[in-house]
UniProtKB/Swiss-Prot annotation:
The lineage of its organism: Bacteria, Pseudomonadati, Pseudomonadota, Gammaproteobacteria, Enterobacterales. Its cofactor is Mn(2+); Mg(2+). Belongs to the RNase HII family. Keywords: Cytoplasm, Endonuclease, Hydrolase, Manganese, Metal-binding, Nuclease. Transmembrane segments: none annotated. It comes from Pectobacterium atrosepticum (strain SCRI 1043 / ATCC BAA-672) (Erwinia carotovora subsp. atroseptica). Residues 11-198 form the RNase H type-2 domain. This is Ribonuclease HII. It catalyses: Endonucleolytic cleavage to 5'-phosphomonoester.
């Protein structure tokens, strides 16, 4: 963890992070994690900085050692209806609501907090400063990446397993050639253009 982060005075803290705001396809996935202070997990860092092998190993360790963890999501239709920011906030609310233990404080990666029934604080670069947020980042990323691999099996021509739905040159090329799948986000500009909605 880079800079020192001063934790709030609370006994049960959940960390929350999201994955999948930028892709053109699939859900935005969030996770909430409450770590067990008596069972520390070594090597937590922002999920994007870890190798896939290390991320998967930490994913299993978090599932085993965390006091509670849960996932939330907002589907492409919700993203299109609400916009990506509001859909992300909704997915975060769902992740916190699904925790088996109710936290008394929530730390959220980024600069905005969704409305929650308990105190919360946004932490910029929280995924590299707060262990609970790092753990949430790992849970969300592994979950979403697996969904993209499954989607790739259904639509093998788009390369979802490689680019995870992000607007790479390859993805944009296939989108233009093949059109949008039912899982593409119709409100995102490259998809809009292909559908003739832009």
């Amino acid at each position: 963890m880079s800079e020192i982060f001063i934790y709030p005075q609370a006994t049960c803290i959940a960390g929350v992070d999201e994955v999948g705001r930028g892709p053109l396809v699939g859900a935005v996935v969030t996770a909430a994690v409450i770590l067990d202070p008596t069972r520390p997990i070594v090597g937590l860092a922002d999920s994007k900085q870890l190798s896939e092998k290390r991320r998967l190993s930490l994913y299993d360790e978090i599932k085993e050692k965390a006091l509670a963890w849960s996932l939330g999501r907002a589907e492409p239709e919700e993203i299109d209806q609400l916009n990506i920011l509001h859909a992300t906030m909704l997915a975060m609310q769902r992740a916190v609501a699904a925790l088996a233990i109710v936290p008394d404080f929530v730390l959220i990666d980024g600069n905005r907090c969704p409305a929650l029934p308990m105190p919360a604080q946004a932490v910029v670069k929280g995924d590299s400063r707060v262990a609970e947020i790092s753990a949430a980042s790992i849970m969300a990323k592994v979950t979403r990446d697996r969904e993209m691999v499954e989607l790739d099996q259904r639509f093998p021509d788009y390369g979802f397993a490689q680019h995870k739905g992000y607007p790479t040159a390859f993805h944009l090329e296939k989108l233009a050639a093949l059109g949008a799948t039912e899982f593409h986000r119709r409100s995102f500009a490259p998809v809009k253009r292909v559908l003739g909605l832009a």
